Amino acid sequence: MAPSCYKDLMPKIVDPQQRRRAVADAVHAVVARCGLEAATLRNVADEAGLAVGSVRHYFTDHDELMIFAVQELGRRVGERVWAHAERLLSGSTGSREDRRRRTEELLAEFLPLDDVRRDEVVLRHTFTTAARTRPPLLTHAEAMQQTLHELVHRTLQGAQTSGGLPADLDLELESVRLRALLDGLGLQAALFPRRFTSDLLREVLHHHLDSLVAASDRGPE
């Protein structure tokens, strides 16, 4: 072991992927707080507590940094949602009401019900909108949106399998419809949080799932 008087001279071992993710954290913080235009290399470096040269060491240019930030956002949302999915949708135990409640709880992960999810919604809409005029972002924004669609689809599928939703539900159609609902609610809540409260968002989601069960119970017209 090196003598204590030499410890400060020993080089630090930095995990490149961990550092890249820390820089992505800084991008997310700047964009959520001040908008995409504020996410310059200088501002991101300041947010991360790094020199601009250090950021450039891990990202060749601004486009690569933004692309990684989009990819990292999609990865984090997916990991967080599926950390809950196994617990909420595993097996078919419990009453139909219990399984339905677990489904609703999982889908609420896509709504801005706390600061973390609120920032995710803001970031998702910001990056997706920016991709319309920034070609380097487009493919990656589309991939993020596809990942989120698959998460919703798998959530409904798991709920259907466990008996929380009707067996005859058109999963693809209802996944698109539910994604549109969740996206719309998320955007409205991000823009007008005093009007679109957490209680209101939960109530709308609850009513939507009620409508799926009710439509199935009525049967074909």
Label every model-predicted segment.
Residues A22, A26-F68, E72:
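Helix-turn-helix
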Residues A22, A26-C34, R80-R87, L123, ...:
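Solvent-exposed, amphipathic alpha-helical segments
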Residues E104-H153:
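Short secondary-structure transition hinges
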Residues M1-Q18, S90, S216-E221:
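N-terminal intrinsically disordered/low-complexity leader segments
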Residues V81-V121, L171-L178:
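Hydrophobic alpha-helical connector segments
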